[in-house]
């Protein structure tokens, strides 16, 4: 009985306490609101250099905050944000836990203005000091904690109920002005639906789905409603890329954070996807459909796409693993492994615009692709890179539109430079300059192999050791200094593909090299024969036949060791041949080191005798038409290697 009376007293006291708090809130809520707005404004001014201006502020109803004529202005630059009306209803009960959660938002006349001009930007206001401070906080608390806090804030500030109209995003730079309007947006406990418009193209887009603030779930579809397929607005202006699609589906199925470990679950898919960026591909890359069921994991020192994730690219299913670790030094890891797939389906599933030379191939058997990469920034020389295509009973039945067999006989070769047509010529006996493999001086053959690809006759098209060294060298230099292309890769690039320095061209080049080398479509001797007859060795000079005549007025079979090493030295920069000579017509002194390195390797491999090595002089006598083009002035060269 005593306990019952005590419980009633405690309950009454609690009710009175809550009532008192609510009463105080009702009495002092407007002054409290003005105080909070002032503190928020001071914090934004101090941390971001932003001035917050609010024309009017008051409570509407019990807990809804009504703001009018809101603006955010950077210290230097155009206004970042303006808003006519904004109504926000927070969750009162979450405030007692020290957490702000927005339950409902109404807004109209909102415009976010992104200005990026030569004289300044209004959104790049975070200083390097603040970025460094933020990075230090991440390292102190760990990646998992930082990402979990971001997700918590995102869901707390994304209201379950929202009604937005007449909102827009404006992007302005020195040459253009682009606007995307959010005509309407509605969200409640059951659904999300919105419509936005690209003002320039008049294209309309819709989004629909569901959202749960408390369960931390999002299921959203985005698709264009215009009859004509159009690019996603602002992507090109901000990134230089063009993106279009029929439908994109994004699902976040919740996340868990405990014991400094974070797990994020979800999936994403797209159909009718088209992408273009000049550094990725010359043509638009098109994918019929793609999807990924993902698990993103994070601990204090790392973030990774877990290997349990499963992705599909048209008919190809693969398991990706990506990891970034920051424990002592930065570590990067990437693993890819496809399922075993019928070979014809593999080729047909490759993206259009990226593997067009091989997509129509029909073949028996199965294929499976594997790749492994790991780089420790503290030990880049120990980089791990392994890439392979596993085949089982693989045999090509039909090449269809592919031209991979064009080298079986005489063919026409066209030369382009920077999209400009230079000339065409036949590679075969009909061309008087064509030189069979046996008709090329062994000195020249071995000089080129020594300088360009010493293991050509022993590898399967790829020199992984050279490629690993290239990765390490370029990473340490923070720029491109060294390539890893084999002669097989150079041949494929010049005969079957264009010379555009794009990721797509490099990927297709690798696949074609694998097809040629692993299936012995051509002998190594035939590959070298074609290579020797198409390589550029001077201004508008292509092939060893033309080069031998141009420089020395002789046939390729008669080339000496010194002449051969000289011609091999031209391969990186054939148009600069004249800068190899001084005013007297002799080779410049810096080439003596090149001669020494190449001849030493040739001697070590027993490609030349000790006597040939000892009497070799770093000099040649140019007697052909090239003699008239040699400049009498000294010129300093700045070397530039091809990235791809």
Residue ranges and their predicted role:
Residues 1-8:
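N-terminal Lys/Arg-rich, disordered targeting/topogenic segments
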Residues 8, 12-75:
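N-terminal amphipathic/hydrophobic interface segments
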Residues 9-12, 89, 474, 619:
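Alpha-helix termini
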Residues 27, 39, 102, 146-153, ...:
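Juxtamembrane regions of bacterial inner-membrane/periplasmic proteins
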Residues 31-34, 59-64, 77-82, 438, ...:
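Generic alpha-helical scaffold signal
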Residues 55-174, 188-223, 236, 253-262, ...:
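Flexible beta-edge/linker motif
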């Amino acid at each position: 009985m005593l306990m019952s009376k005590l419980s009633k007293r405690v309950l009454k006291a609690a009710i009175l306490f809550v009532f008192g708090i609510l009463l105080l809130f009702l009495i002092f809520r407007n002054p409290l609101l003005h105080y909070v707005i002032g503190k928020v404004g001071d914090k934004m001014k101090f941390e971001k250099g932003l001035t917050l201006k609010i024309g009017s502020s008051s409570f509407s109803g019990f807990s809804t905050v009504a703001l009018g004529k809101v603006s955010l202005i950077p210290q230097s630059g155009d206004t970042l944000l303006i808003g006519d009306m904004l109504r926000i209803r927070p969750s009162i009960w979450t405030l007692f836990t020290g957490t702000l959660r927005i339950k409902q938002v109404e807004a109209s006349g909102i415009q976010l203005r992104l200005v990026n001009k030569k004289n300044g930007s209004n959104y790049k206001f975070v200083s390097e000091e603040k970025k460094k401070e933020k990075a230090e906080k991440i390292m102190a608390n760990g990646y998992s904690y930082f990402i979990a806090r971001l997700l918590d804030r995102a869901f707390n500030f994304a209201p379950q109920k929202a009604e937005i109209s007449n909102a827009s995003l404006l992007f302005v730079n020195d040459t253009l002005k682009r606007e995307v309007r959010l005509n309407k947006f509605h969200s409640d406990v059951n659904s999300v639906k919105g419509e936005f418009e690209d003002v320039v193209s008049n294209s309309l887009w819709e989004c629909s789905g569901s959202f749960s603030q408390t369960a931390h779930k999002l299921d959203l579809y985005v698709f264009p409603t215009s009859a004509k397929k159009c690019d996603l607005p602002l992507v090109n202006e901000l990134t230089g890329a063009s993106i279009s699609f029929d439908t994109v589906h994004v699902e976040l199925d919740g996340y868990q954070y405990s014991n400094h470990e974070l797990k994020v679950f979800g999936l994403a898919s797209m159909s009718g996807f088209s992408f273009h960026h000049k550094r990725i591909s010359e043509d638009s890359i098109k994918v019929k459909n793609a999807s990924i069921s993902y698990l993103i994991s994070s601990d204090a020192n790392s973030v990774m796409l877990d290997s349990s994730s499963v992705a599909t690219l048209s008919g190809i299913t693969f398991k990706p693993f990506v990891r970034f670790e920051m424990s002592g030094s930065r570590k990067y890891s990437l693993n890819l492994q496809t399922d075993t797939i019928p070979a014809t389906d593999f080729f047909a599933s490759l993206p259009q615009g990226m593997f067009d030379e091989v997509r129509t191939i029909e073949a028996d058997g199965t294929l499976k692709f594997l790749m492994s990469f790991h780089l420790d920034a503290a030990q880049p020389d120990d980089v791990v890179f392994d890439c392979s295509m596993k085949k089982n009973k693989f045999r090509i039945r039909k090449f269809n539109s592919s031209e991979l067999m064009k080298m079986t006989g005489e063919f026409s070769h066209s030369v382009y430079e920077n999209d400009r047509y230079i000339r065409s010529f036949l590679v075969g006996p009909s061309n008087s300059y064509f030189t069979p493999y046996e008709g090329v001086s062994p000195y020249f053959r071995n000089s080129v192999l020594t300088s360009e690809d010493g293991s050509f006759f022993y590898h399967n098209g790829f020199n992984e050791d050279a490629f690993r060294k290239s990765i390490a060298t370029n990473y340490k230099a923070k720029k491109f200094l060294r390539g890893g292309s084999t002669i097989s890769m150079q041949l494929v690039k010049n005969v079957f593909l264009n010379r555009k320095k794009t990721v797509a061209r490099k990927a297709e080049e690798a696949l074609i090299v694998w097809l040629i080398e692993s299936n012995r479509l051509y002998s190594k001797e035939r590959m070298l024969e074609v290579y020797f007859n198409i390589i550029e060795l001077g201004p508008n000079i292509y092939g060893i036949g033309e080069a031998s005549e141009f420089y020395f007025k002789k046939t390729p079979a008669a080339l000496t060791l010194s002449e051969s090493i000289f011609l091999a030295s031209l391969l990186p920069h054939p148009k600069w041949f004249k800068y190899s000579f001084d005013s007297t017509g002799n080779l410049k002194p810096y080439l003596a080191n090149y001669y020494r390195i190449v001849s030493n390797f040739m001697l070590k491999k027993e490609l030349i005798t000790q006597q040939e090595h000892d009497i070799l002089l770093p000099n040649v006598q140019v007697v052909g038409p090239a003699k008239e083009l040699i400049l009498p002035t000294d010129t300093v060269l700045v070397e530039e290697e091809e990235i791809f």
